[in-house]
């Protein structure tokens, strides 16, 4: 899986249609789109590079803002692992070279259906990066998306995700 899509609860099928149409326009006629058993969340496996999807949707919001209605957030996922602190840390280490020595970062944890401690995860991941932390304007976001027993991990530029709310605020 390389994308997490969030939507309003009970609008999963409309969201599935919307993201299918977007992916079709980009050249993927057969993406795998799954309900993960949590309301308001879909996981997507597509052949399209996630950053290309984010750029496309952001441009669509400028050109035709009414076209994106159901995809509240589109979140690229670079790795998936089990929801265990050691495994999460091992996978973050595999991606760590994305962040250069002088770059700032922020660690963001989003948890659903788990009791794992955010503070423990942040403490372990922070040990990997000697870089400056910037909570407001980081160069990079180390994103840990926990969905029950599975965890998606990404290291993204600050503008590497799509948020419908942010896009609407920017256009006003």
What is the role of each PLM region?
Residues 1-172:
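SAM-dependent transferase fold signal centered on methyltransferase-like domains
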């Amino acid at each position: 899986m390389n994308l997490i899509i969030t939507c309003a609860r009970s609008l999963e099928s409309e969201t599935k249609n919307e993201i299918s149409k977007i992916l079709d326009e980009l050249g993927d006629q057969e993406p795998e789109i799954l309900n993960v058993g949590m309301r308001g969340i879909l996981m997507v496996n597509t052949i399209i590079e996630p950053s290309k999807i984010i750029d496309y949707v952001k441009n669509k919001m400028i050109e035709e803002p009414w076209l994106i209605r159901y995809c509240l957030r589109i979140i690229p996922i670079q790795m998936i692992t089990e929801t265990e602190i050691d495994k999460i840390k091992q996978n973050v280490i595999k991606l760590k070279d994305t962040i250069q020595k002088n770059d700032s970062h922020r660690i963001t944890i989003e948890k659903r259906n788990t009791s794992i401690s955010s503070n423990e995860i942040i403490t372990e991941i922070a040990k990997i990066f000697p870089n400056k932390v910037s909570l407001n304007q980081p160069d990079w976001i180390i994103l840990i998306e926990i969905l029950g027993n599975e965890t998606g991990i990404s290291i993204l530029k600050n503008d590497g995700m799509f948020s419908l709310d942010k896009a609407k605020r920017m256009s006003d």
